[in-house]
Amino acid sequence: MTIDGRENGAHERFREGLVIPAMPLALSAEREFDPVSQRAILRYYVDAGSGGIAVGVHSTQFAIRELPAFFENVLTFARDIIADWTQRRETRVVMIAGVCGKTRQAISEARLARSLGYDAGLLSLSAYPQASVDELVEHVRTITREIPVIGFYLQTAVGGRRLPYEFWRRFAELENIWGIKVAPFDRYATLDVMRGVADSGRAGELALYTGNDDAIVADLLTKYRPAGRARSSFCARARTRRPVVCRSRRTFSRLARTSPR
């Protein structure tokens, strides 16, 4: 794997639009890791047509980092199961690892994910609730030197923070950025991302995925016209006829590709 993820085609597939479920952590009745159930979940995602799998995010984001080596063990287990099952099924899956914490921790997690063959990191900024835009951008820039980054706009109700238009414009201008998962559950915050990406000049290069569970259909179908620009597409056609196992899929792709009026 190269640091930009182009060698295995993962970057291009991510840009085309995929269904990418967040892997839940399977536990036994004794609250211990259940490898049999975990394997079944991962195989189901592949068989259902998922184009990517995100590991160490969502319901597994925090707890697996509290036990020594458990984060690495979960990432390794998921990688091995997906590699084996996709080979049997003659398909490919983009592997995304969650990356969180302050810069030192995030660097360590990014390096681990890259060493295990993950294609990109979904970067949480929850560890910086009071940081300035300059500080946030520098943090992201540091992580992009380790692994391709997908931004994550998490709703404030579950630990996210408000991220302004200026941050998203500068975020989109950084190198080695693949896209953004937009899940603030807020239309105005979502529009800040749209405007920031459009004004970055890189709208045609980045893929934007919706995690707005309260507005999935609207995100997939709405077209936007940022001020001073031609119409922007907020949606992508479905890439699979199989059951959708996760609602976080590409939207907002190739925003404002044309020049101002």
Segments from the language model and where they lie:
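Catalytic alpha/beta core domains of metabolic enzymes, predominantly
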Residues: T142-R145, Q155-R261
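Active-site beta->alpha loop and helix N-cap motifs at the rims of alpha/beta catalytic domains
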Residues: T2-R162
